[in-house]
């Protein structure tokens, strides 16, 4: 029954060929034989053959003036590589065809290319898409279709847009399937996407074979698959994938145009199984000619679906007809081969004399065809646009395009200016329905539900448990792991683009003691005992040779911790230190200056400053120095002296307060300095030093030159403190080496006793450990960056470090972990303005006094007048009034003399005014 259907179908095509060809034949035109090698009786090749004849009919009906007419000769390849080669040899040898259209598959094309090259007959294929055909480098082969590798950039753009880090190619085991892999692998490597596995489906795979392969894929963590195979095989694969649960939410399937362009040949069940997948589809631009052709096709062949291969066959035929017309009709013969010799059938085909000329014209033909612009570049068409579709229900929906210049865009007319600002996938593509009718973007990688959890090893620490602490719940007997490193890791897992199941396992012996140091723990990952290590593990070069580290999640190094000693010296002359020598001398000078100035202004009018010479000298010194501590007994009566004394009182107030504050600071403050300043001084002295047990620091110290006898290990902060307090003379150490994260914890506990003076060794920090090649490394590193840039990192740091640093600053960010208040010695520069004010007031007061004195003593002995009492001064009258009020026993006498005193005072004032008004 099946054979009879094929027979009648072939018979129909034969009569249609004859009908269409006869319409294009005119008497007097040169008939040129061309061959078509195709799988006669199959749907897609039959569509292409019909399009070939429609192309010839349309071409010659619109160009009746052309002198050539192509005559199509069909060779049935019988869906076989050898059959295709046999058909081609028969067409060349018996029909002497000048060119061959076809064959259908890439495997068949390999042989035909060799035959065409041997006989100089151009082979124009409209369906062989394998990139491997290009490697044959035959000038007589033309690909009137798109090479499969041309779409890898669109696939790469999609994977990069969604941030998937691993993909698994699923392809057919033949030339067509394998051809795309080299370019696809290179493109994915450009964006750091791994291919952990390649799923190769045999050409004649059974349902059982496909199920076994799909189960392998299901048990892998990767959830992104790229399918490149024939549409018929893809239908079977997706039906099985849906049955096995690989079309649920979380999976991503991307189909190449090899599947999408042949989608119409798949039955409805197969299409429904593909719901949610993404596809790369050949973009056919809309045109009036294309719409007209589609209408004609539906009228003539309503039962047959037009596809892109038919359009390419139509354009390839048009191009060949144009090229043959341009090549002319001269020398269309084949050169004969000497058949007398023992030659093979392939060698006996002869050489086409028309081939070289036709080769040139085919290479230069250019026109706008039904499938778009037609022009050969290096023997093949060059695509610039691919359409991105999303399978929904029993159909497909366009969600965007990929263009060579702009990448992924929603619309082709999108302006390039706006493309540069796009940042998220909804800006590039339309809404997508993923497998399982999911609307959220799949993460692309997850631990299989039937797979095991990650076994994560954690170090068992004795001291510094703020970073990692392992305890056992006495009620449930379960292990409890806490600490800064653990909390940071859990925050990183929350920031991952997919779910990761894990379980912590302490690296300890059955008795609870540590099972080894960090090197031993890291080595367990290399041996496969642990899937990862989380803790205070330092990134080192020797460790990275057998494991992979993530980016550091915490800065680290090696700090040198030394004791502090107070270097402030307190002696019997400490009271002089608050003020500089210059300030002491300046103050002393001003004491004498103020005392002498006040005596000068007061001794002629104030009895307190008169008397014998020795009495007046002692009064000067007494008055000058007594102003510093208490009010002097001597009264100050003149305006100039009072102004000077008030100013000097203010200066003394400021000076004494500053002196008191500086002296108090000097007597109570500490100037703490380290006992040792560098590692080189330790080596030079041969001092004993301490180091953290189970850390890499021991190896660093041995490399530096410290003898083993001078190295003392410790586990806890308390042990380190005890060793440093003892000192090297009492069985302790002179200094200790700790990692900088532990330095923060140690100095937070002993901030006023020790100091970090140097970081002699630089390392890359703390990182999480994974096996070499683990796909988790890149994603965990990106998640570390996300957490480090978020408020969560500050929150974790405050939770585990600030509680010990509340009374002490951060010893890492602040180089001086024990800042002290050092007394500052005061100098003249701090008070020069005050001294200047006193000096100016003094000069003004003395200047006025001198002027008045000289004015009143004109022509007299100045020195005698200077020593005499000024009886004419108004101060004398004021002094008498004050004295009379202060003597109660003379109250009657004072009362009787009131009128006389008032009269005398007024008379003196009037006399002074008449003498010099300014002297009041």
Curated annotation (Swiss-Prot):
Gene Ontology annotations of biological process type: calcium ion transport; calcium-mediated signaling; cellular response to amino acid stimulus
A molecular function (GO) term: glutamate receptor activity
InterPro entries assigned to the protein according to its UniProt record, in alphabetical order: ANF_lig-bd_rcpt, GABAb_receptor_plant_PBP1, Glu/Gly-bd, Ionotropic_Glu_rcpt, Iontro_rcpt_C, Iontropic_Glu_rcpt_pln, Peripla_BP_I
Membrane topology (Extracellular): 25-580, 657-830
Glycosylation sites: 53, 204, 267, 331, 342, 477, 542, 702
Taxonomy, superkingdom: Eukaryota
Keywords: Glycoprotein, Ion channel, Ion transport, Ligand-gated ion channel, Membrane, Receptor, Signal, Transmembrane, Transmembrane helix, Transport
Leader sequence segment: 1-24
Cysteines engaged in disulfide bonds, as pairs: none
Job description of the protein: Glutamate-gated receptor that probably acts as a non-selective cation channel. May be involved in light-signal transduction and calcium homeostasis via the regulation of calcium influx into cells.
Complex and partners: May form heteromers.
Entry similarity comment: Belongs to the glutamate-gated ion channel (TC 1.A.10.1) family.
Protein name: Glutamate receptor 2.2
Organism annotation: Arabidopsis thaliana
